[in-house]
Amino acid sequence: RARFEEMVSRVIAYIHAGDIRQANLTQRLLGHLPAGLDPFMLYRRLRVLSPAPFSAFLTVPDGTAIASASPERFLGLDAQGHVVTRPIKGTRPRGRTPAEDEALARELVGSEKDQAENLMIVDLLRNDLSRVCRLGSVAVSELAELESFANVHHLVSEVRGTLLPNLGPVDLLRAPFPGGLITVAPKIRPMEIFNELVPPRRGPYCGGMSCLGFDG
């Protein structure tokens, strides 16, 4: 805790100095699986406890297993070149009773802080997509709409565009990566500060997973 509080203090100092406007500090928590437990069984349990539309399980050659349950679509591209990103910024827990749940949802929708942060991410993604999409095609189709999941309420926005005809999925992925939800804006200086303050490197945590198919 002391280490994390020190990181927060240093980030606040960077904000006061004008280096950044905000930062997304996190802590990586470590645990140990019981001997013999199949990581895929852990993933299946995760899907029960925290169902999400973009759940994924991946194993890599070094034996690492990655289990993810994310409600966020970072990027989508169909065969016609239509691009969509649905950033999330703004979160409240689900309530223990219907009345508490509704109150928490109203609080989130009415939060000026969460609305401002959501708008910042939308502006960042509009700029990112404009570099690889047809001129005039990038537009905000949803702004800070409330969406409720098993354990949380989120504010979700949607930005759409049409990919330039001479570009492909990899070009699209390069434009906004790493995601603005993690880096915030502007991107470069916050990433430099993360590398300085947050040991070890985040790796798959706060990263992204993708699937490329012939249908886009």
PLM regions: where:
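Extended alpha-helical targeting/anchoring segments
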Residues: 1-216
